[in-house]
Amino acid sequence: MRIGRIIATAIFFALLGTPAAPADKIVPRAGHAIAPLPTDEAVRKGMVTIRDLVRTNHSLVTHRRMPPDHALRFAAQVKVEADRILATSNLSGEAQEKLRALLEEVVTGIGAVAKPDAGISPMDGLVRADEALARYPQEFDHPGWAPAQSLE
């Protein structure tokens, strides 16, 4: 038993001397409990493109002036960009899973703008996409990000 305690104590002290996380790991920002997940250039560029698409079309949706063919193009552009982000990004693990879920919310929301019969009204779909885009900088590290609504 004594040898087991000695080994356990040695392992304990060895672990104390080992840093818990690599030095280059992203750390929490002021006011945040957890660190944002990392992004890469493909994610940052693609998310800015999606944000700009939403921003450009926002008032057409809110004022109910978007023609159906324009709504279909808008939804298709957002879907293509979301697919491009997922195909070209080097994220893995939790970051990739959370990004996939966030992009699915955006695509589903904007899809409701194009196909209001899907059970979600165009306005509710736009709100869903806006909320996902507003949540993005809380979950991911994207310096300088501003949600679609704050840009108007």
List PLM regions with ranges.
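Short, charged, amphipathic alpha-helical segments
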Residues: 68-76, 96-104, 123-131
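Bacterial N-terminal signal peptides that target proteins for export
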Residues: 1-8
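Amphipathic, well-ordered alpha-helical segments in soluble domains
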Residues: 46-53, 74-77, 81, 102-109, ...
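Immediate post-signal-peptide N-terminus of mature secreted/exported proteins
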Residues: 22-69, 148
